[in-house]
């Protein structure tokens, strides 16, 4: 998918400023109490998602996250298909006071072992 220059600049800034968690660490972090938060649209979530993950679409994140995850100290692993929406969501959560918000580097595709073909796939901050 081709993104607009402004959208990609926002996503790149989020990727640079929020920690990307390697997919090999996701299951361990979730087992230790982290919440995997699927921020894709409901239709995407219904097709596939990380087992046990919560769902809150990116478009409703700011309105619904406080009811869904009231603890500002909670470790939250935002994810989408690749990187952009996950990183943008983690950045938004940090602005809202969720200091342990991160994103899953490579998103669901990487978690499932699929190659990340997004243009910023090699820019993930670990």
Please report, for each region that a protein language model flagged, where it lies by residue:
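Rhodanese-like catalytic fold shared by cysteine-dependent sulfurtransferases
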Residues: 1-35, 42-75, 81-126
